[in-house]
Amino acid sequence: MFTGSIVAIVTPMDEKGNVCRASLKKLIDYHVASGTSAIVSVGTTGESATLNHDEHADVVMMTLELANGRIPVIAGTGANATAEAISLTQRFNDSGIVGCLTVTPYYNRPSQEGLYQHFKAIAEHTDLPQILYNVPSRTGCDLLPETVGRLAKVKNIIGIKEATGNLTRVNQIKELVSDDFVLLSGDDVSALDFMQLGGHGVISVTANVAARDMAQMCKLAAEGHFAEARVINQRLMPLHNKLFVEPNPIPVKWACKELGLVATDTLRLPMTPITDSGRETVRAALKHAGLL
């Protein structure tokens, strides 16, 4: 469940900015049918930053309910205060989710020792498997391989989503962790190369709109068929890139609407609707991928 193509799913909203249950069900059904390995609910792409804690928990639980055992659900539970991250994580104890994706604290930029103590404290307050999430381009904080190696010794810290796009990190981390420590790319552009170096899969934005292709690419990679996987990846490469032509999740939410997967591309401020030029750029990438 922690390998292959795991989607960082969008949180669909109605025109008033409320979570749209019908669109969420449609998305989940799409991922079940497409072979997606698991869903990350309310991560960065799921607009965690603009949901309050009650809404955050409600969306995760709604996702779990609508999935109904058909696909594993991972909860995004990161926060920049350790006590807050613990509180959010504990909401999902005994809920049925299979694990938590926990981003490094953002804005306050802790030291490596602070990061170690932060993640260790969270893990000690739950039995849920914990996946570390390193995305310094968003957080201003880089979880270094040496710290990952220390954290990998904590019993329920089972993997990392490594979103630096720096492929040297794969081997650096592999040298410091056990073979069963899960290495997931958080960068669609370099995900296939990441897997060829020994990674186990990707937590993907592209999978929101190209779920079957991403699942097949990851399956081929896991089987060692990298030439075939690369054919799929090259077709998706413009999409990997152009889904970030404006801040995530603006482009991917619009793409979901364009493909009829959600009813609206509504976002909450300070996120704003996609621009006309962004729309045309993403539409061209969708066509290149064979999705339009």
UniProtKB/Swiss-Prot annotation:
**What GO biological process terms does the UniProt entry carry, in alphabetical order?**
diaminopimelate biosynthetic process; lysine biosynthetic process via diaminopimelate
List, from the UniProt record, the residues annotated as the active site of this protein. Answer: 133, 161
Where along the chain is pyruvate bound? 45, 203
| Signal peptide residues on this chain, from the entry's feature table | none
Under the subunit heading, UniProt states: Homotetramer; dimer of dimers.
Q: What is known about what this protein does?
A: Catalyzes the condensation of (S)-aspartate-beta-semialdehyde [(S)-ASA] and pyruvate to 4-hydroxy-tetrahydrodipicolinate (HTPA).
Q: What is this protein called?
A: 4-hydroxy-tetrahydrodipicolinate synthase
Annotated organism of origin: Shigella dysenteriae serotype 1 (strain Sd197)
The opening ranks of the lineage are: Bacteria, Pseudomonadati, Pseudomonadota, Gammaproteobacteria, Enterobacterales
